[in-house]
Amino acid sequence: MSQEILNVEGMSCGHCKSAVESALNNIDGVTSAEVNLENGQVSVQYDDSKVAVSQMKDAIEDQGYDVV
């Protein structure tokens, strides 16, 4: 199991948090995703044999947020 901390711009409310967490949790191989709105970060636990960081970034960007 691996962990990645992603910096995300544009998240400001509970809806943002829910949208990003849901998008990530729907990816096969992601075991948990937790958004911290205060610091604009997402902590993701995942199986790196099933999912790549680029797939997680794409899922976040598809929700309208920028991964920096």
Swiss-Prot record:
Every HMA domain range: 2-68
Regions that span the bilayer: none
Designated name of the protein: Copper chaperone CopZ
Top-level division of the source organism's lineage: Bacteria
Organism of origin: Staphylococcus aureus (strain bovine RF122 / ET3-1)
UniProt keyword annotation of Cell wall biogenesis/degradation present: no
Function, in words: Chaperone that serves for the intracellular sequestration and transport of Cu(+). Delivers Cu(+) to the copper-exporting P-type ATPase A (CopA).
The entry's keywords: Chaperone, Copper, Cytoplasm, Metal-binding
Pfam families for this protein: HMA
